[in-house]
């Protein structure tokens, strides 16, 4: 049995049907509404509404469109909540991975502080070696103060140039992030728990919205909500 979907056609009709084509915007399907022997299409709705007065037909269309929009808004809210949960769960997983990697890095970094630039006193041997090196500073003033210093570049790996971490200060990005309440693991877990409770609430609302559409479609044309709407207007 093909899955039936709610389809939106222009601004007038919305049908529950198994039809699916490229120029139709299919929405969330509801299996509980698709038990009829004949799929609900625009033609079927037209045939049914010919039994009603113009006012009854208009009331049915308005109630049907309203129920459809309400259902789709609840589905959209559910998707947004699920997306937020997924993002938070990914952030929590990345946090744990970053914290594990930073702990390993801190344990292996030597305690000696190394810097990218190293100062060396200017000597005659240093001057000779600098003049023969393509990466040296060869245009220094030879009449400069002999006590002055020059900067030499050494081939030191970049990761080893970082200063040793202070044992009393968190050195990793994850540790600094944990100090802020918004990105701490416990805060993310609390947010995830809250979002799951909202998901349960929205699912309950979706079930109620589906019941409204079920009443409009399966009990048509004697729908209780349709009869109430007919009596309350005009």
Curated annotation (Swiss-Prot):
Region (Disordered): 118-144, 162-189
Compositional bias of kind Polar residues: 170-189
UniProt feature, compositional bias: Low complexity: 123-138
Localization in the cell: Cytoplasm; Nucleus
Keyword Secreted part of the UniProt annotation: no
A GO CC annotation given for this chain: cytoplasm
Function: Has a role in meiosis.
Protein's UniProt name: Meiotically up-regulated gene 166 protein
Primary gene name: mug166
